[in-house]
Amino acid sequence: MDQLTIERQAPVIAQYDAVVCGGGPAGWVAAVSAARNGCRTALIEKMSYLGGTPTAGLVDPISGGYHKGKRVLGGVGWEFVERLVAAGAGQVELPKGHVSFDPEYYKLLAQRMVLEAGVELYTNTVVSACQMADGRVTHVLIESKDGLQALAAGTVIDATGDGLVCRRAGVPMQVSAGGMQPMSLCFLLRNVDVTTALLRDHIHHTGLHGQSKHMGIYHALQKLAEQGEDVPQFGGPWFNSTMQEDLICVNITRAAANAADRAQLTQAECRMREDAYKLVALLRKLYPEFAKASIAEIAAQGGVRETYHIRGLYTLSGADILGGAPCADGVAFCSHPVDIHSAQDNTQTAQYFDTPCPVPYRVMVAAGFDNLIAAG
């Protein structure tokens, strides 16, 4: 392969105490927290809006805010939920504490909270590289319509979802021994009758506490496949509220790919876009509730479950998660079960734990890098 050597200059346009790369849930919340604690903070996001997986990926609901009826979600995240609910754009369904939300209002509220905190927001901007010196990230290089620029950084938070900044900095990465979990491409479906027994216990905005994953539809699709019908690979399916009566969010497509690989990601998203229409056509044939259904919107990006993991100062083990032992540097609690989706078929496993799992700060700090933290 031919190689090009390119020399470019990047003006240093600003200096920040904290530069957060990625405006998904982990990123924008980290930026708000940093700014509220007195840091001059920049938030870099490739899309024109914030939210990441919940908005660009249409992954709904926000899962696991409660554990056995007790709230474990706190801080900026819970403040966000309270403001969603107050605006009529979200609903907390007990006892699990799943939060149904309006994806468009999510974008607006995240933006409001970021700007209210004094964060300097860089949308439509990508992180291209970082500059290192003595084991520290000194500058983050960004590209936008303004060209290549640099931000001087005291601390860098990598909330890109696939460790992009960490990989650029040379942090050792690892992948799961069993391979990466598959991704999904969610979509919004209009003209679905959610008032009958088929769906009403699976849609969060009804206020009922039914399981979101629809085993009845799962088995019906499996049966069609066994009969020789052309059924694309699927997961779930899950049907969730958007807080709008005429739109539901559907999580059903599935593709095994490394989402940190451009070619694999392109192929997977193209295939899942085709699969979404095939699966909706099958649902129209199977159930009168879907007879008039049509796709209103397909997510702008795939819902990625897994890519790379950093090697931090500490690695959270299965025993840590299932044991729920307290730790001195815990910064958050996880109450969602450990669910592993198979890349080979449409199955998944889930492990539930007795007590919420504390997430230690040590797992997010890149080993050997003083000022680089991975979140999300």
Language-model segment annotations:
Residues 17, 138, 154:
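Conserved acidic residues
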